[in-house]
Amino acid sequence: MSKVLDEVLQANAAYAANFGEKGKLSMPPARRFAVLTCMDARLQPSRFAGLAEGDAHVIRNAGGRASDDAIRSLVISYKLLGTREWFVIHHTDCGMETFTDDVMADLLANSLETAAIDEKGWHDTGKGPGSTDGWFIKWLTIKNQADSVLEDVRRIRNHALVPASIPVYGYIYDVKSGRLIEVTEATKAGRAAA
């Protein structure tokens, strides 16, 4: 058994021992909102948004981007589970700003091993085999945080399956201060219809 697996199972045993009434939480989120944010381990939506278990849906992916799958989850969150407000929250110092689609595709074509970054950029540390399948994926990398938040809010707002009644707010989480910074233009673009 790996050390990580052992630690996770021990933590779960302690958590389950004190689970209490959480098994009675209803499936729809109590506070009726959803957050789309990055998978970065420094971001803890339960902390920065004041969430308890059962409060909100949290959808995470690399960059917190409005991918087809993220929008699928948001639509299910609304249509079947009743969320009424959505947040798109990207963050400062995001790894998605450190590469382009071409860089990622090249890295994968060379090797499937973990890459490394230094002052010269990303490079492979292992040897092949790689795969050219990375050329067929849109990696949704980020050039500018405010622009990417605006782009994602607009993509959600204009999606045919997203009701005009749902407000979509755009924010950037500052990893140095813990503060949420509104991207005013994004929140404006995500306004619900009156």
Question: Residue ranges of each PLM-predicted region?
Answer:
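Divalent-metal-activated hydrolytic enzyme cores
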Residues: 2-29, 64-66, 76-81, 96-194
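Short, hydrophobic/glycine-enriched beta-strand segments
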Residues: 7, 33-37, 85
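Divalent metal-coordination and catalytic microenvironments
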Residues: 12, 35, 59, 88, ...
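Conserved beta-strand-loop surface patch within small alpha/beta domains used
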Residues: 18-72
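Gly/Ser/Thr-rich loops at beta-strand to alpha-helix junctions
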Residues: 39-41, 92-96
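Short glycine/serine/threonine-biased micro-segments
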Residues: 48, 52, 61, 93, ...
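Generic internal hydrophobic packing segments that stabilize the cores of diverse globular domains
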Residues: 56, 71-74, 85-86, 101, ...
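Ordered, amphipathic secondary-structure segments that act as subunit-interaction surfaces
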Residues: 81-94
